Amino acid sequence: MNDILAKILAVKAEEVATARQMRSEAELLREAQARQDVRGFAQAIEDKISQGKAGVIAEIKKASPSKGVLRENFDPAEIAASYAMHGAACLSVLTDVQFFQGSHDNLRRARAACSLPVLRKDFIIDPYQIISARAMGADCVLLIVATLAPAQLRDLETLAIDLGMDVLVEVHDAKELDAALALRTPLIGINNRNLRTFETTLQTTLDLLPMIPAGKRVVTESGILKPEDVRLMREHDVQAFLVGEAFMRANDPGVELARLVA
């Protein structure tokens, strides 16, 4: 595991410990279970694809560790509304504070501004974060295989499903894919960015595709920057995309979404 990822995970452990002191897991769970407003995340992607369109998970993030601030003029609600207007299937909202300048409030504001299902994009290592995701309104959570043991993956997925959420499981190589395929979720995210070198190549998705059985929905993540990238993926029957940076750098993220998948 590289230094930046190890540092992020160490910070996450501290954050969870602090959050638990401020609010018990039992109290948070009651709030999460009381919410009856889950929006179907995986279904929204399938609905778009069944219409012959790309299933785009449009991301809302102000910054990243590798690129710094991506968007100075940052209004999560405005961005969410623009994405919804221009054909996004779902939203992905960064909730990490220290490394991505995200927040729980960004997710709440984005979700309130539209009717799209929302992924909590964060580095999840503890059940408390799954419960917190539903309590803040998330409809789906991200589990990154590189950061979790197989037993953790299973337990966190089960908790998310029990709370009514979908799960996007993220992989970077064949070994991680094996672990992901042992889970129940149909959503397999292939991150084209190597978490160790931070280099990006779409070949990562193309290389792993033959190993993925029918019944799973591949979501290609990172490095989707231009219409040709989308066309290449769709030619290989990859119909779902998680895109952030290309949209965040545009004047109007939703307009850029429409241009990318036109």
Swiss-Prot record:
Which segments of the protein form a coiled coil according to its record?
none
Give one GO term, molecular function aspect. Answer: phosphoribosylanthranilate isomerase activity
Species whose genome carries this gene? Bordetella pertussis (strain Tohama I / ATCC BAA-589 / NCTC 13251)
Q: What protein name does the entry list? A: Indole-3-glycerol phosphate synthase
Record Gene3D superfamilies: Aldolase class I
Instruction: For this UniProt record, give its keywords in alphabetical order, as a comma-separated list.
Output: Amino-acid biosynthesis, Aromatic amino acid biosynthesis, Decarboxylase, Lyase, Tryptophan biosynthesis
Q: Which HAMAP family match?
A: IGPS_B
The pathway it acts in is: Amino-acid biosynthesis; L-tryptophan biosynthesis; L-tryptophan from chorismate: step 4/5
Give the catalysed reaction(s), semicolon-separated: 1-(2-carboxyphenylamino)-1-deoxy-D-ribulose 5-phosphate + H(+) = (1S,2R)-1-C-(indol-3-yl)glycerol 3-phosphate + CO2 + H2O
GO BP term, pick one = L-tryptophan biosynthetic process
Homology family: Belongs to the TrpC family.
State the Pfam families in the record: IGPS
Q: What class of enzyme is it?
A: lyase
Q: What is its EC number?
A: 4.1.1.48
